[in-house]
């Protein structure tokens, strides 16, 4: 009976450590996702700006009909 209690206590202890490590890893992953979202926003802004600049000459050509 005593060895059963020891093994159950050991399993509980190891499980608790495992859960705390998983929680820390999950928190780190969430922080990375937040950083990735900010980087994606910057990339989208850059793409949008480059597309707008590329479309300007075509727009002037259509409006003023001087190509």
Swiss-Prot record:
Signal peptide region: 1-22
Disulfide bonds: 61-67
Annotated Pfam families: Antimicrobial_1 (PF08018), FSAP_sig_propep (PF03032)
Propeptide, chain numbering: 23-45
Location(s), subcellular: Secreted
Keywords attached to this entry: Amphibian defense peptide, Antibiotic, Antimicrobial, Cleavage on pair of basic residues, Cytolysis, Disulfide bond, Hemolysis, Secreted, Signal
Tissue specificity note: Expressed by the skin glands.
Coiled coil spans: none
Entry's Gene Ontology BP terms: defense response to Gram-negative bacterium; defense response to Gram-positive bacterium; hemolysis in another organism
Chief location bin: secreted
GO cellular component: extracellular region
Family label: Belongs to the frog skin active peptide (FSAP) family. Brevinin subfamily.
Function: Antimicrobial peptide. Has low activity against the Gram-positive bacterium S.aureus (MIC=12.5 uM) and the Gram-negative bacterium E.coli (MIC=25 uM). Has weak hemolytic activity against human erythrocytes.
Descriptive protein name: Brevinin-1CDYa
Lineage: Eukaryota, Metazoa, Chordata, Craniata, Vertebrata
């Amino acid at each position: 009976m005593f060895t059963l209690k020891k093994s159950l206590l050991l399993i509980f202890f190891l499980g608790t450590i495992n859960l705390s490590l998983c929680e820390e890893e999950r928190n780190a992953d969430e922080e990375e996702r937040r950083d990735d979202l900010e980087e994606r926003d910057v990339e989208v802004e850059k793409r949008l700006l480059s597309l707008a600049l590329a479309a300007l000459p075509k727009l002037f050509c259509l409006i003023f009909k001087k190509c």
